[in-house]
Amino acid sequence: MLGRELRLRWRMCALRLLAISLGILLCTHFSAELRRRSGPPEKLVVAKVESTARDLNKRAEEMPSRRQVIYVRRSSSSSKAANPATNRRDNNKPIRWHIDLQPWASSSHSLDSEAIRFLRYITTTQIICSHRIKNGQTDQSVDASKPWTVCLDEKFNLAHQIRNKQCRVYSLGLGEDDNNFEVNMASRGCEVHRFDPSIASTQIHEGERLWHHRLSIDWRDPKPAIATHKLHITTKKLGTILNEFGHWKIDVLKADMESAEWKILENLILEGVVEQIGQLIFEIHLHWPGFEVSGNDSSVVRYWYSLFKELERKDFKLFYTYKDLSKPQRFLKKEIYNASSCYILSWVNTRWT
């Protein structure tokens, strides 16, 4: 009896020890699991968040800006041409919303000071051109009413482009009958596009190299809500037309826009289109401020001057200036400063060499 009782007690003790050992083992396992889950997960979560943030930032840097304006199709090649005349515009540049106004000519902000500075600027050439041709003609004895003048000095790109039959001319006008410049430039081998909203057909192909388009160049595109067929004429920005035509550059841009030239020139500067132009020939009108140019007389003249200084910053140099004495001699509706109401100015982009 005593032996049996001892064996039962031993078995009970063994079972208790086994239960205690099993409990200790389970507690140790659960404790280790809890430590593993409570420590590293925070690091894992933080690492994952940081990795996600880096991915998002990388994607944001790689995505093009929503505000970027693209007017020309992108080249499939990433390399840039050595000649500035064939370089594409940098579409990653930030958009400019206004030009940089020049400091006032004097502390008094007077019209006299602004007008004297401006008139001196437009009547003083900045670079010498030894080989100028007017209206596309070599014969300088021809008396042209409007001397649209280009520079064919060898140091500039236009002479080479004409020789290689690769030059392109854009002519902007409003019902102008005289197209001698366009015809003569086409006969020299240039591809000439004349934009005039007054022509009868949508497009007229004259000869081998001259196209007439029933389009009016504006400083803004028409609102999308306005249907095209409701417009009497089609108006577009020059950058939009470049994109639609697939043109990367313009060797010569001639413009006679009857006081719309100021806002058009501003648009070309702000959107970088002017950098794709080799030579500019503009007829400017000074008898009134121009379309959508506001402010008092001093502010208007300061704005005009600032536009031309913007061109100068882009390395455009004035090589020809013409004062039209056949037009009224008025400056902002006044007969002052011995100024004409109309001048023709020619610039060359000295980056195109």
Swiss-Prot record:
Keyword flag Methyltransferase: yes
A single GO cellular-component term on record: extracellular region
GO biological process per UniProt: methylation
Keywords (A to Z) from UniProt: Methyltransferase, Secreted, Signal, Transferase
Region of interest (Disordered), residue spans: 73-92
Matching InterPro entries: Methyltranfer_dom, METTL24
A single GO molecular function term of this UniProt record: methyltransferase activity
Cellular compartments annotated: Secreted
Signal peptide: 1-27
Enzyme class: transferase
Family from the record: Belongs to the methyltransferase superfamily.
Protein name: Probable methyltransferase-like protein 24
Gene for this chain: mettl24
